[in-house]
Amino acid sequence: MTNPWIVSLLLGATLVQANLYPPAVLNLGPEVIKKHLTQALENHDATAILQELPLLRGMQDKSGSIPILDSFVNTVLRYIIWMKVTSANILQLVVQPSTYDQELVVRIPLDMVAGLNTPLIKTIVEFQMSTEVQALIRVERSKNGPARLNLSDCSSNESTLRLSLLHKLSFVVNSLAKNVMNLLMPALPQIVKSHLCPVIQQAFDDMYEDFLRLTTAPIALSPGALEFDLLSPAIQDSNILFNLKAKLLDSQARVTNWFNGSATPLMETTPDRAPFSLTVRQDLVNAIVTTLIPQEELVILLRFVIPDVARQLQMDIKEINAEAANKLGPTQMLKIFTHSTPHIVLNEGGATAAQSVVLEVFPTNTDVRPFFSLGIEASYEAQFFIAENRLMLNFNNVSIERIKLMISDIKLFDPEVLKDTLTKILEYTLLPNENGKLRTGIPMSMPKALGYEKAMWSVSKGALKLTPASS
């Protein structure tokens, strides 16, 4: 029989080779796993199943293969009218790492009170039953499909079972209760396994499907949509990781861009102390920004929009060519061509955006040939934040890094003399236009679906990370 450690090691190696750097990683910590598995157990009425455990039949089945023990059981059972679990509670689950790779241990403590009715006494004899169910969550590969998480090896061990009489009664009744507990000790683990483990399996499968639905739900963009799909699951420490691929769709639901595994380093995906995190690779962030802010041409009648800057530009041009400055009319016009959409750079200190534009100055709106054309490389501060469950991005603080004179009909000049004026033009025209396209934000339902009302975005080298906000 193959050692499970070897299988896990080979599987883990396969996953690492196949998906070194996924476009996005959803990291679910033990807090989220416990919360959602507990809810799934409640949905399947796990405590009601415990209250229906067939204690008497379980003791009989356990002793049936041993004639002497079977005779003893029958003798004891003659003094019992009925016996059942009167109350049951599932205590706080524990999720912890396994000694094997790609495996988690889930411990489910149970606290039950059982009662039996005997003609030896008018009151019900009650005793406490405490035990624990243990199951393993593993990454397993199917012959017919990709790897998935599976729950296996669900069992209840006699070593975790504790039985005690709640109230001491007469010597005869106490002796009967002691004999019953002695018979339950070997029988109860199998009873729990037979009746509760299938429910735990169903609850886990439901939880897993809920996580996948949550992960793959389309995220609306304006225009189009972003969709994630599962590349591979993984287990690291006490956390479940979903390595995700992504695709961008246009307004007609046609795929415009695919993102799968990449040889480019993604980010640090080692689980941290956050209950969950969604980490998105920088190139996917940039593709989303490109969808929201396509390349375009802006036409601005400068004196109508920002008259102060129009006068400042006229004074700057006068220093270069006074005759040309006098030709600037009331309909003085600018054209700004966004040669590229803003390119986001994510680093530990924050996010910046770089963009190349071509700016042309026309004396009036009827002229077809500009005074001059400038190639401008600008950078902005990029701020990511959450507002009303939406991812928001805002650009501010324009800085011009480089200016190149491309065409000039007035005379050759050093474009650096226009830097201050050009900075104001971009600040008052291009940035508001692009921020306006970002104003609707991107809906993020994941935090709320995982049970967290508030979330926050943080920036690290090459990645954007969503985590619950500190309360």
From Swiss-Prot:
InterPro entries: Bactericidal_perm-incr_a/b_dom, Bpifb1, Lipid-bd_serum_glycop_C, Lipid-bd_serum_glycop_N. GO terms for cellular component: extracellular region; extracellular space. It comes from the Eukaryota. It holds the Pfam family LBP_BPI_CETP_C. Glycans are attached at N150, N157, N260, N397. One of its GO terms (biological process) is negative regulation of toll-like receptor 4 signaling pathway. It is found in: Secreted. GO terms for molecular function: lipid binding. The keyword Transcription regulation does not apply. Residues 1-18 form the signal peptide. The keyword Magnesium does not apply. Its main location: secreted. Keywords: Disulfide bond, Glycoprotein, Immunity, Innate immunity, Secreted, Signal. Disulfide bonds join C154-C197. Belongs to the BPI/LBP/Plunc superfamily. Plunc family. May play a role in innate immunity in mouth, nose and lungs. Binds bacterial lipopolysaccharide (LPS) and modulates the cellular responses to LPS. This is BPI fold-containing family B member 1. It comes from Rattus norvegicus. The gene is Bpifb1.
